[in-house]
A protein has these predicted regions:
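Beta-strand segments within the central parallel beta-sheet cores of soluble alpha/beta enzyme folds
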Residues: 41-53, 307-318, 322, 368-390, ...
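Functionally critical mobile loop/hinge segments
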Residues: 52, 414-416, 421-523
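Accessory "access/gating" subregions that flank catalytic or transport cores
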Residues: 203-309, 371-403, 407, 498, ...
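Glycine-rich nucleotide/cofactor/substrate-binding loop typically near the N-terminus or early
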Residues: 54-94
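Intrinsically disordered, low-complexity terminal tails and inter-domain linkers enriched
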Residues: 305-375
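C-terminal regulatory domains involved in ligand/effector binding and gene-expression control
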Residues: 78-253, 262
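Conserved phosphate/anionic-ligand binding catalytic regions in large, soluble enzymes, centered on
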Residues: 11-29, 276-295, 346, 408-417
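Alpha-helical support elements that line or immediately flank enzyme active sites
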Residues: 20-37, 293-305, 364, 374, ...
Length: 523
């Protein structure tokens, strides 16, 4: 069994405000509805009910869980559904019939979804049971699902299926990951790419990573353009848009020392979009979704063309590192780049001057410096995401990425470590510097509680992402100033996070029963 989780599962496009409380339950309800349809039972269904246990029951209303369940029972997919179709789907339920799986109308009332916050099932703190009854009230089907963090779900009685044979490079710990990379002569990103290409073609991997990044970038743009208040009784005001305006005004006067402030604005933008139920990418969760995109955008906007890397090199496997990756001296390092030459429209990931396309040598093509810069950035983001995927897989396999299971250390701490490692990679860091950066970032989030005020993913979640984004950058810079050797290993920190999560009171694990949630007055 391998710890590795595909980037296309770890970074999933969905809706806010929570991966474990919105995306996961929607997927579970959708799976239940699909099973009714596929088994033919749907023709006999007269009613569908659901029970939300533990953390899902405690903070479900603030996290939009019942709304997500209704959307999932309709057959809607979090990756493609219009976010407006999910918002308040249960909260503003007018009564009448629910179209299950898009096929059968059954009577539905708001109290068909029951909240049981004091009941915790042994499988996971985030549990829900869905029941289909016939017209006489007899049970036709019943399934219990666990939303295990990051939008991942598991059906009761179903083992977590991780087929090691599908991945050529198998590792369960950071130590094993580094050993595999040493043995194969790979960067961490290249190791992840090898595993991804066991499932998809090289072009499909590149295009898929680009799609993930584009969704992240659109989320940042949407958050920076929005204003007003976020949903819920706290009436929290959006700030990303006003900060953007202030920063743009400052830049217009000639101030240029603003990258760190933009970093915070990027993170706020994502998490404000998430809190509003908008389109967001799990990274690795929704509650921590602003950290990695903010750090990646910080690199894209302020560092990608600066040449701030370590050395200029191409690995034996063709991946650019250091300044070559960052676009420094791109004319000499890369030669011409011809966009959109691949069959699927994706730009080539590796360009050799003697390659001919349609009889024309690339070194005879007209150099498009803007295309070179764009291609370099795209390569960098793919490297960033692949590195983060390998690191995030370790947290998911050996500890947790669920706030209901491990507190906020599991969500924000993991995301911060992934972002720190990704940034270190695109800044030309070695594998051991990457591991060091991830360790630094996680170490200083140990013990962090998940205590959302009012059960909403707003306070302290939104600001916390901005602070963690800054921490990720600091961790990367510290690691890059070292040689990769350090006293505390990433594996030791992952295990410490796991143990701390076990010891942590449930009051501090996404139940809103302790911490800020009981000391801040809801107005």
């Amino acid at each position: 069994m391998s710890a590795y989780v595909s980037a296309f599962e770890l970074f999933s496009i969905g809706v806010g405000p929570s991966s474990s409380h919105t995306v996961g339950p929607m997927r579970a309800a959708r799976d239940f509805a699909a099973r009714l349809r596929d088994t033919g039972l749907i023709a006999r269904v007269g009613r569908v009910t659901g029970t939300l246990y533990g953390s899902l029951g405690a903070t479900g209303i603030g996290h939009g869980t019942p709304d997500a369940v209704v959307a999932g029972l309709r057959g809607q997919d979090p990756a493609t559904v219009d976010p407006d179709a999910v918002r308040r789907a249960w909260s503003d339920w007018p009564g009448g019939a629910l179209l299950v799986a898009g096929e059968r109308e059954v009577p539905f009332a708001k109290d068909d979804i029951v909240f049981a916050p004091r009941t915790r099932l042994p499988g996971h703190p985030n549990a829900m049971t869905l029941v289909a009854l016939d017209t006489d009230g007899r049970t036709l089907a019943e399934e219990t699902y666990f939303s295990i963090g990051g939008g991942f779900i598991r059906r009761e009685g179903e083992e977590v299926r991780v087929a090691a044979q599908q991945f050529p490079l198998v590792f369960d710990t950071a130590e094993e990951l580094l050993a595999v990379c040493d043995e194969q002569g790979l960067t961490i990103a290249e190791a992840a790419r090898r595993n991804e290409e066991a499932l998809r073609s090289e072009a499909e991997v590149a295009a898929g990573l680009d799609e993930i990044w584009d969704a992240m970038a659109r989320c940042i743009e949407a958050g920076l353009a929005a204003d007003g208040e976020l949903p819920g009784m706290l009436r929290v005001k959006r700030r990303a848009g006003s900060i953007r305006q202030q920063l743009e005004d400052a830049e217009a006067t000639g101030r240029r020392e603003l990258p760190g402030e933009w970093l915070g604005a990027f993170a706020l933008a994502v998490n404000e979009e998430n809190a509003s139920g908008g389109r967001v990418v799990t990274a690795p969760t929704n509650g921590a979704a602003g950290i990695l995109p903010a750090v990646a955008m910080y690199w894209w906007r302020f560092l990608a063309d600066s040449g701030l890397g370590v050395g200029n090199a191409v690995t034996p496997h063709g991946e650019l590192v250091g300044s070559a990756l960052l676009g420094f001296a791109a004319r000499q390092q890369l030669g011409p780049v011809v966009p959109d030459v691949a069959a699927d429209g994706a730009a080539l990931d590796r360009v050799a001057p003697d390659v001919a396309l349609d009889g024309v040598r690339l070194d005879e093509a007209v150099l498009d410096e803007a295309a070179v810069a764009e291609a370099n950035r795209r390569r960098g983001i793919r490297r960033f995401l692949l590195t983060a995927t390998a690191l995030g897989s370790l947290f998911k396999a050996n500890a947790s990425i669920s706030g209901a299971e491990g507190g906020c250390q599991a969500e924000v701490g993991s995301a911060c470590a992934m972002a720190a490692g990704g940034l270190t990679a695109v800044m030309g860091g070695t594998n051991r510097q990457i591991e060091n950066a991830a360790e630094i970032a996680m170490e200083h989030h140990l013990g962090l509680t998940c205590d959302p005020v009012g059960g909403l993913v707003q306070i302290p979640c939104i600001e916390r992402n901005a602070i963690a984004a800054s921490t990720a950058v600091t961790a990367a810079r510290l690691a890059l100033r070292g040689d990769g050797s350090h006293y505390v290993s990433l594996d030791a920190v992952v295990e410490t996070m796991r143990q701390t999560g076990i010891d942590m009171s449930t009051k501090y694990k996404e139940t809103s029963e302790g911490g800020l949630a009981v000391n801040v007055i809801e107005c």
